[in-house]
């Protein structure tokens, strides 16, 4: 599943291609994603201009502003995209016939009329493409966004933030991080990696971790995610960036998917356990 780094890599790739371009038309081939695609989406998008491409957690947020043809009452709207398990957004600068799993095309043009196509592909159809009317404040109240935790690169996110929000919590720290209500985007791969960097065993009760150890964990989360973004994310199955390139963070993973292999720090064999139906990897010597 694409996690925060993969979504951010996609966003960074889309920004120079989409920002300021006018949407010529949208073609929906399959409406049956995780939630049905609005049948009116082509009409809602046509003629609008992409103002910004943002990210909140694992959601891509594409702001589409109206032109005069939409009438004086028309306001900004947002395209919310979640990549699900196997979704990708590709920018096509030359025409290409759609494949079986290419569910949505958004055709855009710049001021000179040069066309590009934004194509959404999702073999398993667990992703989502939703429309939301309103400004950014209204968007933040969307049911899918309003309960998300803080962004890991927000300056307010630190050890004190995590310590204060985990008092009395008996659940394992990895389970708490994956829930996303304290900090967003620390998915399964990067959770194992961050906990290793911080020297914290993933089964440790969140409420028993000290303030200094949370400071180390907050820094490890930021560093791990930043490294992953710089390496184009992780490609475990289907993920590619908007340019079609695979990520390679997983090639240098410290613990993830390395069960039985020697720890890169101390040489102890990496262990694998299951937490909440997800595989967890850790070093029993380095993580306490």
Swiss-Prot record:
Binds 1 zinc ion per subunit. The keyword Protease does not apply. It comes from the Bacteria. Pfam families: Fapy_DNA_glyco, H2TH, zf-FPG_IleRS. SUPFAM superfamilies: Glucocorticoid receptor-like (DNA-binding domain), N-terminal domain of MutM-like DNA repair proteins, S13-like H2TH domain. Keywords: DNA damage, DNA repair, DNA-binding, Glycosidase, Hydrolase, Lyase, Metal-binding, Multifunctional enzyme, Zinc, Zinc-finger. It catalyses: Hydrolysis of DNA containing ring-opened 7-methylguanine residues, releasing 2,6-diamino-4-hydroxy-5-(N-methyl)formamidopyrimidine; 2'-deoxyribonucleotide-(2'-deoxyribose 5'-phosphate)-2'-deoxyribonucleotide-DNA = a 3'-end 2'-deoxyribonucleotide-(2,3-dehydro-2,3-deoxyribose 5'-phosphate)-DNA + a 5'-end 5'-phospho-2'-deoxyribonucleoside-DNA + H(+). One of its GO terms (biological process) is base-excision repair. A zinc finger (FPG-type) spans 254-288. Its cofactor is Zn(2+). DNA binds at residues 101, 124, 169. Its EC number is 3.2.2.23, 4.2.99.18. The keyword Repeat does not apply. GO terms for molecular function: 8-oxo-7,8-dihydroguanine DNA N-glycosylase activity; class I DNA-(apurinic or apyrimidinic site) endonuclease activity; damaged DNA binding; zinc ion binding. The active site is at residues 2-3, 58, 278. Monomer. PANTHER family: FORMAMIDOPYRIMIDINE-DNA GLYCOSYLASE (PTHR22993:SF9). Belongs to the FPG family. NCBIfam families: fpg, PRK01103.1. Involved in base excision repair of DNA damaged by oxidation or by mutagenic agents. Acts as a DNA glycosylase that recognizes and removes damaged bases. Has a preference for oxidized purines, such as 7,8-dihydro-8-oxoguanine (8-oxoG). Has AP (apurinic/apyrimidinic) lyase activity and introduces nicks in the DNA strand. Cleaves the DNA backbone by beta-delta elimination to generate a single-strand break at the site of the removed base with both 3'- and 5'-phosphates. This is Formamidopyrimidine-DNA glycosylase. It comes from Ralstonia nicotianae (strain ATCC BAA-1114 / GMI1000) (Ralstonia solanacearum). The gene is mutM.
């Amino acid at each position: 599943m694409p996690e925060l780094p993969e979504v951010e890599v996609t966003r960074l790739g889309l920004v120079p291609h989409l920002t300021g371009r006018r949407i010529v038309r949208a073609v929906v081939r399959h409406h049956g994603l995780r939630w049905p695609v609005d049948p009116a989406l082509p009409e809602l998008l046509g003629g609008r201009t992409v103002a910004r491409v943002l990210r909140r957690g694992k959601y891509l947020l594409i702001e589409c502003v109206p032109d005069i043809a939409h009438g004086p009452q028309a306001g900004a709207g947002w395209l919310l995209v979640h990549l699900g398990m196997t979704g990708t957004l590709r920018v096509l600068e030359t025409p290409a016939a759609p494949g079986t799993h290419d569910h949505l095309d958004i055709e855009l043009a710049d001021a000179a009329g040069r066309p590009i196509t934004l194509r959404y592909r999702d073999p398993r159809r667990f992703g989502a493409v939703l429309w939301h009317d309103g400004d950014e404040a209204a968007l933040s109240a969307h049911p899918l966004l309003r309960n998300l935790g803080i962004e890991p690169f927000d300056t307010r996110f630190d050890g004190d933030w995590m310590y204060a929000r985990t008092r009395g919590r008996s659940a394992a720290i990895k389970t708490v991080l994956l829930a996303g209500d304290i900090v967003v985007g620390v998915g399964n791969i990067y959770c194992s990696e961050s906990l290793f960097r911080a020297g914290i065993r993933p089964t440790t009760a969140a409420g028993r971790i000290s303030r200094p150890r949370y400071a180390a964990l907050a820094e490890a989360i930021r560093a791990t995610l930043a490294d992953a973004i710089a390496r184009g994310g992780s490609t475990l199955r289907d993920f590619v960036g908007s340019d079609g390139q695979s990520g390679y963070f997983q090639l240098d993973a410290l613990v993830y998917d390395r069960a039985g292999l020697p720890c890169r720090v101390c040489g102890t064999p990496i262990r694998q356990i299951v937490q909440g139906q997800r595989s967890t990897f850790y070093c029993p010597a380095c993580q306490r």
